[in-house]
Amino acid sequence: MSFIEVKHINKTFKVPLKSKGRFSTLKTFFNRKYRYINAIQDVSFSIKKGEIVGYIGPNGAGKSTTIKILSGILVPDSGNVVIDHMTPWKDRKKYVSEIGVVFGQRSQLWWDIPAIDSFNLLKDIYKIDDNEYKKNLNELIELLNLKDIINIPVRQLSLGNRMKCEIAAALIHKPKILFLDEPTIGLDAVSKKIVRNFIKKINKLNKVTVILTTHDMSDIEALAKRIILIGKGKILYDGTLSKLKKEYDYIRKISIITKDKLELNNEYIVSQNKIENGLEFKIDIRKIEINEFIKLISSKISIIDIDIDSGNIDELIVKLYEDFKI
């Protein structure tokens, strides 16, 4: 059985309609009308222990509703969720001790006190043994390089350092599952790299299962091999990022610096042009692997240098949204 099993969950929100004109508030009071929003519809997926999964989609797609159900905040109208033999909203007390949540735009740290004081409070909330807490804290301090910042009031920390402390707070009780919502929002390139490397480390060291929701596709590319795409409340794609690229982003540009001449007429060649100091090929990677193509070229000409355009993940996702009309 999978570590996370989501089966046919649905959630509809009832939203009151506002009347227009004079006495609209009074009219609404006596004759209130509603509209119904299907936030998620028949959503099903499973996740293995230790997986990092990117859960993506445009605004209003149903990502947040799904995460709130998985974290036990919301109860679905129908369907079921089993995570590590627990149902989030039924086994809430036990379940919340096994999950960590990081929201990029919301803080679980107390603003006016040092992060270490928040960590100490979380120790009591989660009832962590003194020795275990000390071990966990030292590990997080070392991995995230927190030694010089945990005694500074949170409001005085840079956004990057604050986010590192947020992640430490979410992991202080050694959760089995980590929900990350926009964990690198607003961070500079260096801070993003630190956060991503840390997520990889704790996933590898502790087999923490990670569900990542973000609009920053570079996070997805750096961390997740598998993505689940949701749009208009429905799962539209569930598979590997590499497979998605092959299906929707299959043209690759390869620029070769060489003094030799070459012309190919194979079915995988989309176009070929002479450029300054060399040749430029556009190939269809559904028909030939890049490594295989380079091996072939190397056997025919002398290569001085080579540049491979790996494609733009943001453009790929935009194209995906357009194809699915979401």
How would you label these PLM feature ranges?
Residues 79-90, 94-95:
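Conserved ABC transporter NBD signature motif
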Residues 196-284:
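ABC transporter nucleotide-binding domain
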Residues 178-182:
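Catalytic Walker B motif of ABC-type/P-loop ATPase nucleotide-binding domains
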Residues 252-326:
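Short, charged/small-residue-rich alpha-helical element at the C-terminal edge
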Residues 174:
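Conserved catalytic motifs of ABC-family nucleotide-binding domains
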Residues 23-28, 120, 124, 132-149:
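Conserved ABC ATPase "signature" region
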